[in-house]
A protein has these predicted regions:
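Conserved small-residue
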Residues: 3-6, 10, 19-123, 245
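Outer-membrane beta-barrel and related beta-rich outer-membrane complex signature
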Residues: 26, 36-52, 152-180, 250-259
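Extracytoplasmic gating/loop element in the C-terminal half of outer-membrane beta-barrel translocons
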Residues: 150-245
């Protein structure tokens, strides 16, 4: 039996057109919601793991499955209190944590941070998608703009995670001011660097971010030259225009672009150095003879 998936949602479309004297204008709003549920994974599998995601029966496709964290250890008192309900010290990779280490949640309270402590942390699927198109005309001028966005989804910033491994001599991402590792800035929330040791760079919710965004996808303004100016040139119509794409994005995501494509459906919410959408401005003319 193959994968069986059920998608549910609704779509709402609202449009408006009007004219006041020489001014024409219109608007079109589309809102879409979608939720999916895995009904069968085939071959009686209870789940499928892929990278930072796990797909399970009766859950969404490619749900994030990660270690949950509670900041980093900044005082010795926090380390001393890092114990099970029975008072047993909690070990990370068989060792007690030190100042600047990540504080992982011991989900099963067995005193050992292992893969069994991972938890479901959110869905890569947006709860709502929206697009808004506005257009207007006044005499020989025309204007249009399109916004789109999605809201309520999570993104795992693999690019940031890979840039924090410090397990070899590879190149790594530069730290922003105020986000330096613990050895440099003890007031930041970035854990200490341990060369050759990845305990502070496990697949954790530290790299899980809000993927919501609202973007000005396209904006255009044009002007049609008057026909009497063109008749001696043998031109029926000449329109000058300027257009821009992806000029403005509102988002809290720290990666290059929250609007990316991951072709691996089992890990669709992970951004691994995805190429961003191009920001562009163009000028042109349309000629009709």
């Amino acid at each position: 039996m193959r994968l069986s998936l059920r998608n549910r949602g609704f779509e709402l479309s609202l449009g408006w057109k009007d004219q006041v004297s020489d001014f024409k204008y219109g608007a079109l709003l589309n809102i879409t919601t979608l939720s999916n549920k895995v009904l069968s994974l085939g071959y009686e599998k209870p789940f499928i793991d892929s990278g930072q995601a796990r797909t399970r029966l009766n859950g969404p496709l490619a749900e994030f499955f990660l270690y949950k964290t509670d900041g980093i250890f900044k005082t010795q008192e926090q380390i001393d209190n890092y114990v099970t309900p029975d008072g047993e010290p909690i070990m990370i990779s068989g060792k007690r944590p030190q100042l600047g280490d990540v504080k992982y949640i011991d989900t099963d309270n067995n005193g050992q941070i292992t893969a069994d402590d991972r938890q479901f942390c959110g869905s890569p699927w947006a709860k709502m998608q929206m697009s808004l198109v506005l257009n207007a005309e006044w005499k020989d001028f025309d204007f249009s703009m399109m916004w789109n966005g999605q809201f309520g989804n999570k993104i795992y910033n693999v690019s940031k995670w890979q840039g924090r491994l410090f397990s070899d001599n590879s190149n790594y991402l530069r730290f922003k001011k105020g986000e330096e590792p613990y050895q440099v800035n003890q007031n930041s929330d970035t854990p200490r660097i341990i060369y050759g040791d990845q305990r502070n760079s496990w697949d954790a919710d530290r790299f899980l971010e809000n993927g919501s965004y609202f973007r000005l996808k396209n904006i255009s303004i044009g002007y049609n030259l008057k026909k009497e100016w063109l008749k001696n040139l043998g031109i029926d119509k000449l329109r000058l225009y300027a257009t821009g794409s992806n000029l403005l994005t509102f988002t809290g995501y720290s990666g290059l672009d929250p609007d990316f494509i991951n072709t691996n459906i089992w890990n669709s919410g992970t951004d691994s150095f995805s190429y961003p959408n191009t920001r562009s401005v163009m000028f042109g003319l349309d000629l009709t003879f």
